[in-house]
């Protein structure tokens, strides 16, 4: 039998043993992921590379602290330091987006969205958002998601000719459907949305306007994308896409919704907040107020436009590759492969061979199943965070265009990717297994 003293010593040893010694299997998997991120080009539109300071905050001792409630009104003792952190995160979020209210506790975007719907509608009420098949999100009413199970759903779609939103048709549909909540925002739509028009429609039919800006929040923070905050009753977002912060969610709103939203997050959706993630959000919101952040967002936009222009070239057109809507206003390009020899899965696999990570994505009116799809969603945020400039983005765009045009020399394209990855190193100085 182990004596109490020996047990205590053993526990102390475990608590001070580095990850590589305590769990080499997990350490090696993390090391492998870091090597993958360093040696490939990350172009999944919902991914980014966080600053090292965000890694440090999220990997801190704050993971030990339970803090149910809100600053000054906790259900646990010892919250004096996490109160400071949450206040910083809330205040900075309000400053960045010009919002009256912020809740920074949602664990993820889906939890933020669930809390928004809980605040604005009752189960069985009607909500109206962009169809998932046309670029919306699961939480905007998809039938297998909580939003599709708890609420009656009316979905609007893009125009079949232009693949853009037709606000006149959305208005007609809203008048006919009379939703309690009108939803703007998207997960795969490459153009600006008219938030003022959405608000006008919502007011006309007596609906609340909720905008999910998860994908384009970083561009909004940098004043490079129209802000939904002045128009919407409530705005939700993730923090890890264009914002480049930790994987988590956040809610912004007019002050009149503060009490309902706070209650819907806690105790409505969650128990204790993840204070290490809240700290990482605070850091991300500080970063979002800098000139360097704005420059990064500018390069994100420029990179996406360079990519769209290259994919509109004659060789890709001849191969049946089409840029949906002809271009982009945001950080991503939607590629339609319906007329090419590739489906979405094959396109994703082909670029993976080259060393570029993207995701297959359904296009509007897609004839293929969701696990195959007829499209690709390609984003530029992570590469902008890595430091790529106009010249480098032009090279990346040409690699992608050449690959999708067909009959490319995969080894030669991979060599070009390797050079770009070497020219723009990631997390220099981090040991393979060490996170901070």
From Swiss-Prot:
Keywords: Amino-acid biosynthesis, Cytoplasm, One-carbon metabolism, Pyridoxal phosphate, Transferase. CDD domains: SHMT (cd00378). The record marks 240 as: Plays an important role in substrate specificity. It catalyses: (6R)-5,10-methylene-5,6,7,8-tetrahydrofolate + glycine + H2O = (6S)-5,6,7,8-tetrahydrofolate + L-serine. Residues 1-18 have a biased composition (Low complexity). Belongs to the SHMT family. This is Serine hydroxymethyltransferase.
């Amino acid at each position: 039998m182990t004596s109490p003293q020996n047990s205590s010593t053993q526990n102390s040893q475990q608590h001070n043993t580095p990850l590589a010694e305590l769990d080499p299997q997990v350490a090696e998997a993390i090391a492998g992921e870091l090597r993958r991120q360093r040696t490939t080009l990350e172009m999944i539109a919902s991914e980014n590379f966080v600053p090292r300071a965000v890694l440090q905050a999220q990997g801190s001792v704050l993971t030990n602290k339970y803090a149910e409630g809100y600053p000054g009104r906790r259900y646990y003792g010892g919250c004096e330091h996490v109160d400071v952190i949450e206040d910083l995160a809330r205040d900075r979020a309000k400053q960045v987006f010009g919002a009256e209210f912020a809740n920074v506790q949602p664990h993820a975007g889906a939890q933020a969205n669930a809390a928004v719907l809980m605040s604005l509608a009752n189960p069985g009420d009607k909500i109206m958002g962009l169809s998932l098949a046309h670029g919306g999100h699961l939480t905007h009413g998809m039938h297998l998601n909580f939003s599709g199970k708890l609420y009656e759903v009316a979905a609007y779609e893009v125009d079949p000719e232009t693949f853009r939103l037709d606000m006149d048709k959305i208005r007609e549909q809203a008048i006919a459907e009379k939703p309690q909540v009108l939803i703007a925002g998207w997960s795969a739509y490459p153009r600006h949305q008219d938030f003022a028009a959405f608000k006008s429609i919502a007011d006309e039919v007596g609906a609340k306007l909720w905008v999910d800006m998860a994908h384009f929040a970083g561009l909004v923070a940098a004043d490079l994308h129209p802000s939904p905050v002045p128009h919407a009753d409530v705005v939700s977002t993730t923090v890890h896409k264009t914002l480049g912060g930790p994987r988590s969610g956040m809610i912004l709103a007019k002050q009149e919704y503060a009490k309902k939203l706070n209650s819907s997050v806690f105790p409505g959706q969650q128990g204790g907040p993840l204070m290490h993630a809240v700290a990482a959000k605070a850091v991300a919101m500080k970063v979002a107020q800098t000139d360097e952040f704005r420059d990064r967002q500018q390069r994100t936009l420029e990179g996406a436009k360079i990519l769209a222009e290259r994919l509109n070239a004659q060789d890709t057109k001849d191969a049946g590759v089409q840029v949906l809507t002809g271009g982009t206003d945001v950080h991503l390009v939607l590629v339609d492969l319906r007329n090419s020899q590739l489906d979405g899965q094959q396109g994703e696999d082909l670029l993976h061979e080259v060393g570029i990570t993207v995701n297959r994505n359904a296009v509007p009116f897609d004839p293929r199943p969701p696990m195959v799809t007829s499209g690709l969603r390609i984003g530029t945020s992570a590469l902008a965070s890595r430091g790529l400039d106009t010249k480098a983005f032009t090279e990346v765009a040409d690699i992608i265009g050449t690959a999708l045009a067909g009959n490319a020399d995969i080894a030669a394209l991979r060599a070009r990717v390797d050079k770009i990855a070497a020219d723009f190193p990631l997390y220099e100085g981090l040991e393979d297994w060490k996170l901070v």
